[in-house]
Amino acid sequence: MSSVLMSKTVTPFLREHIPSIYAPIGKPGNQETARAENPNSKYCYRHHPDSKCRRAADKAKMVMIQSELDKLTSADQQAVTHVWSLFSAAPARHRDLMLQGILSQLCFPQLSFVSREVNEALKIDFISALPVELAQKVLCYLDTVSLTKAAQVSQRWRTLADSDAVWVRMCEQHVNRKCTKCGWGLPLLERKKLRNYTRQRQLAKGGPQGRVTELADSHDSQDRSVNQHGKRPAAEAEEEDPIKKRQCMAAAEASKAVTQPKTRSWKAVYRDRWQVSYNWKNSRYKLSVLKGHENGVTCLQLDDNILATGSYDTTIKIWNIETEECIRTLVGHTAGIRALQFDDSKLISGSLDHTIKVWNWHTGECLSTFAAHTDSVISVHFDGHLLASGSSDKTVKIFDFNSKETYCLKGHSDWVNSTHVDIKSRTVFSASDDTTIKLWDLDTRQVIRTYEGHVGHVQQVLILPPEYEPDEEVLNGASQDNQDAMSVSSGGSGSPSMSHAQIERAGSPGSHSSSHNLLPSSLPSGDEDVRHLYGSAFVADESRPLPPRYFMTGGLDSTMRLWDSATGRCLRTLFGHLEGVWSLAGDTIRVISGANDGMVKTWEPRSGKCDATYTGHCGPVTCVGLSDSLMASGSEDGTIRLHSFKPCRQ
């Protein structure tokens, strides 16, 4: 192309369009008119100088292009450069026209080359380009593996992927619950750390006599020498020596600096819990065997760093889990210990000597003894100011520590092996050798419902947390089975509906429930329907909390059963143990069971799947305990096996 021809064709084109490219300010007048007359007077979103999608030129590619261009003759270099200049200066409509013409002339190898180049050019960093709030919203949909990979892309991605706004959502979805999407559930550790901190503060304050009278929330209590405003009385402050006063202030500041909790990111919170959950899922644990009892271990309770065990040797031992040492032995019963429970200040035990004792487990002192039963005490459970005990005399005794009242609940025809008080709803669950479980109303002292289904002695009743919800397929399957049963019993009418009067009778005190006489699961959808199922006492007082909805039981028929306390339905039966189930423990994430076959099993409570089986005991496993990162089991072989799922660094 001659210079004359070039000046006649290329120069006018560039003269017309280049100013709008390098000075895209827009023409005066109406904005829409200016945009229509000057379509390239505004930057596109990709080439706008402020756009985060705009990438710097690829240095390697530019060097390669320059190298290839240098290989051409001067005329060819000028021609190629003019093509680039024309395309660069062309408006959007002209560019589209140029590209269509060029693409229509390309052969397949050239089309493949264009496809590869376009594929790379279309990739933009949309996370960095989006506003922070939208980018975090997008990242909230990723799982943990994808999030950790996203944090490795760039510093910008790492800042967004590690932000608290993303990981707090992840914690809400997994901590203290089972995620319905991925199946992972993470333990709630902070509550236990708070208790440990409270206990350490109590130990540092003074002797054990003062600790007995403190409540579980004693970390909120104030020093007696400090008034409501956090100040000492003026007279007392004036009497203090100035030097001593400065020393006290310095010590207080140092103590405050040490004890003040550090702020942690939500990602770190999630990581700590994920490590514990990973160890549970893969059965990675540290095993400790505690020996000290001279006979079989019958009961235990695990709480943070303290383990309490009872035995047929008539003693109760208090263990320090970290040091694996017995720090105290409680002696006073004259026969084997069958049940115990403790909190921060007291321990209550039930024995074969027909008595219940209240201990100060910090000192080993027996504070009081109750001789309310006429036979062996098999179970004890307290909640607040109420204590329930079950005995081989076939009765349940209720002790009210506030009113000093004691009364008896009669209805079982055999030993009462397990009791559980729910102080909010003022109800008690009891399990018996007569193969039934009963729900009692403490206001009327009558049976609300009797649950039938086990064919062997029922040894344990485990109340599931309020957050627990069974799988929908469990509810749907149970509902379908129940509807079929009702259709048959109604002469094939096919109508599963029940009248209001039937609901009243089904929820009345003393009613029986079994797998063949159940209420449809579609009924208790609202609070009013559920209240009718628990009887007239709950209907009359709408402010009264309802009893726990779901619970599990273990029996000597080698099965565990999941129950709906409102309908009386057995929702699921868990099989796996070869011999009778003696003990259960659980939380929102897992349930563990100990049986006469010497095995401990962990279960997923929603699906009913057995996650793992632990062996090692040389006798029946009579008791189990569970915390977020620990599992304890006691056996008639006289040992306690402690499984710690804490990360090694802890």
Swiss-Prot record:
Domain F-box intervals: 124-170
Region (Disordered): 200-244, 482-525
Effect of V138D: Leads to constitutive sulfur system repression
GO molecular function terms listed in the Swiss-Prot or TrEMBL record: ubiquitin binding
Keyword Transcription regulation set for record: yes
Pathway: Protein modification; protein ubiquitination
Biased composition (Low complexity): 487-499, 507-525
Quaternary structure (record): Component of the SCF(scon-2) E3 ubiquitin ligase complex.
Function of the molecule: Component of the SCF(scon-2) E3 ubiquitin ligase complex involved in the regulation of sulfur metabolite repression, probably by mediating the inactivation or degradation of the metR transcription factor.
Designated name of the protein: Probable E3 ubiquitin ligase complex SCF subunit scon-2
Organism: Neurospora crassa (strain ATCC 24698 / 74-OR23-1A / CBS 708.71 / DSM 1257 / FGSC 987)
Gene coding for it: scon-2
